[in-house]
Design a protein with these regions (language model features):
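Conserved N-terminal phosphate-binding loop of PLP-dependent enzymes in the Aspartate aminotransferase
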Residues: 1-188
């Protein structure tokens, strides 16, 4: 969503006394070039959910709550909560994020990809932030995605019938992004 939408949403929830819960399960953990996607708009949520990137593929989820919410003993029960291996993995992920500057890399490489993708004729619209990018076409992308995977050996996601989603690893380099651009042009 646009920054304007996020600001209006935050204002509306505050005026109405409604808790703002943001799902950052896919868009969080550096994917958009900020640690959480909603940080681009400068708003603060009451609750933020996260998973996926939190433990680099090991099953784990978490949430952050505003200090306005006070924990109550016995309020939360969970079968798998506090898994030691998951917690150790999550700490290691944060250490690697900092050491390898993965959030900054996602921002930098994502900006490069967005700029280059917008130059390609035949793509109706390119949108996104960081390494969470969508390319919209005027036609169904099923055959294009098939050519990408079978002829160019490039895996992409889809959203609807006319949208290709790009969610590459946060370690993607500019050179690898350029290789993708070359292969995409060949498939087009």
């Amino acid at each position: 969503p646009s920054d304007e939408f996020m600001h209006q949403l935050r204002t509306l929830t505050q005026e109405s006394g409604v808790v703002l819960i943001l799902d950052e399960i896919q868009s969080g953990y550096g994917r958009t070039g900020k640690f959480f996607a909603h940080q681009w708009s400068g708003i603060k949520a009451d609750i933020v959910t996260m998973a996926k990137g939190i433990c680099n593929g090991y099953p784990m989820g978490a949430l952050i709550c505003s200090p306005e919410f006070k924990p109550v003993y016995g309020m939360l029960g969970t079968t798998f909560g506090g898994n030691h291996l998951g917690c150790a993995g999550a700490i290691a992920v944060l250490e690697i994020f900092e050491k390898e500057q993965l959030v900054e890399n996602a921002r930098k490489v994502g900006e490069h990809l967005l700029t280059e993708l917008k130059k390609i004729p035949g793509i109706k619209e390119v949108r996104g932030r960081g390494l969470m990018i969508g390319m919209e076409f005027d036609y169904p992308v099923k055959e294009l995605r098939s050519r990408l995977i079978h002829e160019q050996h490039v895996f992409t996601g889809a959203s609807g019938t006319n949208m290709i989603r790009l969610l590459p690893p946060l370690t993607l380099t500019i050179a690898q992004a350029d290789e993708f651009i070359t292969r995409l042009k060949s498939a087009l």
